Amino acid sequence: MSTAFDAGNGKITVPDILGRKTSTPSSPNQSSDRGGSDRRRIVCLTAYDYPTARLLDEAGVDVVLVGDSVGMVVLGYENTLPLTVEEMLHHTRAVRRGVRRALLVADMPYGSFHGDKDEAVRNAVRFVKEAGAEAVKVEGGERRMELIAQMVEAEIPVMGHIGLTPQSLHAFGGFRVQGKTLEAAQQLLRDARAVEAAGAFSIVLESIPRELAARITSELRIPTIGIGAGPECDGQILVLHDMIGLSLGHTPKFARRYANVGEAISHAVAAYAEDVREGRFPADEESYHLSSEVRERLLAIRRS
């Protein structure tokens, strides 16, 4: 499949996502009840391979994220930390081949942007140049402000990510809801403002209280993408494997299951195995045949 895009065919771009912001910044004291049905929330999901990416794209997903969650749900790592740039590039290339309409965002893995900023920008360039990503996602708030600005200066669109940032797993002491105290909530507000000021075109809010996410969403001019952050965000994202019942480990509270693909696979494999062992597969209709002439000549050769 060609990776050339035709904007006239509904290709979603970074400006399109920016234009999907569903409200204007409000007063800090103004409450936000954004549950109206007229909102065009941004639909985001993860993908890690060509067929899944193509299915998501054809289903109308707005943003496809090649998340570093691939390390856990596909590669079997205990967490996202061991994932390398090369592994992420490999999966991003595969997803690129399946995505034509959606905006393709690639996660910057742990260690790829934590040291020298110039090296971090070079790593981000690789995702765009070598793998076809249209944006990268960077975890962190205020402490990543200069880095995000430098990437944006290099014309690399950046999606921010604050709250529960899985790459900070050890610092947080596990996968825990963030922003529950006043001090922590205020820090996340500062983080969100810093990410916006640095030039990010959107920001993921993960595992934070609904009320805090609503406050951040009402203050920012860029779209917020929630994952365990309540319905007031401008969009939502889930790890696909959690949503379709294909995760083998713990499924977060915020992940609604829309299918049980894992169970379907188990049943299908068990049925296949039984048919093979009992000689029921393959059947005649699943087999190829010689013509009668060739069959007779072959039998004659065997008798001679």
What do the PLM-derived regions correspond to, one by one?
Residues 2-25, 33-292, 297, 301-304:
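Alpha/beta enzyme core
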